[in-house]
């Protein structure tokens, strides 16, 4: 039975593109020198982490992982990419982020995306 007075027909969950836009805004707002030092780090948004990643970390559910840094951190010779090296990448996982957002109404979605992104960038910086 639908509740009268609540028309949700025009509302949809934030998309992968929406999360990517929030992440791009967070990256653009980074202060120097962090902005320039993270310029080569790519950001990718997916629904969930791959099953092998969830298993690697011993997690029971893909909802447990909101973000992941892959690559070689700056303190481990990752400041300058080597031939054949994949770029350092921050992965953001949309469904886990949205689930966290639904459970923690004191934070905006932008705040959560920014927090996860900065946490993962911390691994880039060592």
Task: Put a short name on every predicted segment.
Residues 112-120:
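Short alpha-helical catalytic segment bearing the HExxH-like zincin motif
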Residues 1-112, 124:
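Active-site rim/adjacent substrate-binding subdomains
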């Amino acid at each position: 039975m639908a509740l009268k007075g609540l028309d949700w027909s025009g509302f949809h969950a934030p998309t992968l593109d929406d999360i990517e836009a929030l992440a791009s805004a967070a990256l653009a707002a980074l202060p120097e020198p962090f902005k320039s030092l993270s310029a080569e780090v790519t950001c990718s948004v997916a629904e969930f982490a791959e099953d092998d990643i969830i298993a690697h970390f011993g997690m029971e559910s893909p909802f447990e992982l909101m973000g992941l840094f892959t690559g070689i951190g700056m303190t481990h010779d990752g400041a300058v990419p080597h031939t054949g090296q994949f770029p350092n990448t921050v992965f953001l996982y949309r469904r886990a982020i949205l689930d966290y957002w639904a459970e923690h109404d004191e934070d905006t979605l932008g705040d959560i995306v920014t927090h996860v992104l900065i946490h993962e960038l911390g691994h880039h910086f060592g």
